[in-house]
């Protein structure tokens, strides 16, 4: 499958990740076809709406805001444009819109486009399957910069979902977070979350499995947001020629 000549658009091209994506598209072998921004200038390759950008693109990379997801899903599905979605903090209705779009176009949706995080998530699923909750307590700790607006992070929730999948349980009914006061003993089947915010930490995630006799922990630290842009461009190039459907970074990395 060739990746030459893939026209890539960037939703939110002037944002923190968008600016990195602009650089990575060119160095990664794609063709930058433009982007969207609220401060778009007339007669440029930056547009005020995704409707205007979509016809110029084979793929759109989207790290914007949860509030735009349902609108973007509809626009890209109607335009037949593939979608790399990295927005986190999505509601059930947002996720349903993503799944509906994936019935018409190829979509890669991931909370984190780092290859390292993808591997940590996969290993967490395997570890959870091998280490029973009756004896191994699963806990997830995440740290991010002070500007981050959602908690736990999308990546932490994705790791938690992997733990739940490995143990064959529902994540929503097994989350323990925000512990304070007299909480009583820890539930044996709980998946615990702890959140730290401060400074300019790009991202750090640790998943641990602790018994009475040992602890196994996996930690991933991001030093530069560029890793997310590099991974997202890799996903965009991979999408060329893919059938409609919902994919993740494990698919992009060929891990399944």
From Swiss-Prot:
Tagged with keyword rRNA processing: no
Metabolic or biological pathway, per its Swiss-Prot or TrEMBL entry: Amino-acid biosynthesis; L-lysine biosynthesis via DAP pathway; (S)-tetrahydrodipicolinate from L-aspartate: step 4/4
Active site, UniProt feature: 144, 148
E.C. designation(s): 1.17.1.8
GO molecular function, one term: NADP binding
Gene3D superfamilies for this protein: Dihydrodipicolinate Reductase, domain 2, NAD(P)-binding Rossmann-like Domain
Pfam family of the protein (one): DapB_C
GO BP, sorted A to Z: diaminopimelate biosynthetic process; lysine biosynthetic process via diaminopimelate
Sequence intervals crossing the membrane: none
Function as written in the Swiss-Prot or TrEMBL entry: Catalyzes the conversion of 4-hydroxy-tetrahydrodipicolinate (HTPA) to tetrahydrodipicolinate.
PANTHER family assigned to the protein according to its UniProt record, in alphabetical order: 4-HYDROXY-TETRAHYDRODIPICOLINATE REDUCTASE 1, CHLOROPLASTIC-RELATED, DIHYDRODIPICOLINATE REDUCTASE
Protein name (record): 4-hydroxy-tetrahydrodipicolinate reductase
Organism the protein comes from: Gluconacetobacter diazotrophicus (strain ATCC 49037 / DSM 5601 / CCUG 37298 / CIP 103539 / LMG 7603 / PAl5)
């Amino acid at each position: 499958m060739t990746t030459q000549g893939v026209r890539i658009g960037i939703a939110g091209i002037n944002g923190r990740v968008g600016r990195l994506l602009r650089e990575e598209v060119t160095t990664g072998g794609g063709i930058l076809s433009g982007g969207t921004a609220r401060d778009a200038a007339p007669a440029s390759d930056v547009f005020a709406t995704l409707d205007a950008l979509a016809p110029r693109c084979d793929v759109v990379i989207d790290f914007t805001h949860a509030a735009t997801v349902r609108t973007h899903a509809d626009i890209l599905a109607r335009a037949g444009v593939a979608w790399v979605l990295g927005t986190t903090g999505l509601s059930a209705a947002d996720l349903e819109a993503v799944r509906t779009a994936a019935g018409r176009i190829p979509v890669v949706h991931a909370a984190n486009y780092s290859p390292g995080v993808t591997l940590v998530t996969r290993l967490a699923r395997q570890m959870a399957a091998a280490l029973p909750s009756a004896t191994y307590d699963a806990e997830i700790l995440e740290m991010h910069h002070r500007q981050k607006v959602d908690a736990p992070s999308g990546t932490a929730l994705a790791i938690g979902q992997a733990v739940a999948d490995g143990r064959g349980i529902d994540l929503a009914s097994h989350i323990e977070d925000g512990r304070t006061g007299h909480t009583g003993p820890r539930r044996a089947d709980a998946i615990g979350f702890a959140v730290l915010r401060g400074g300019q930490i790009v991202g750090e995630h640790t998943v641990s499995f602790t018994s009475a006799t040992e602890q196994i922990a996996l930690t991933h630290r991001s030093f530069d947001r560029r890793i997310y842009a590099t991974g997202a461009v890799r996903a965009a190039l991979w999408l060329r020629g893919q059938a409609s459907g919902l994919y993740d970074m494990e698919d992009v990395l060929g891990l399944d």
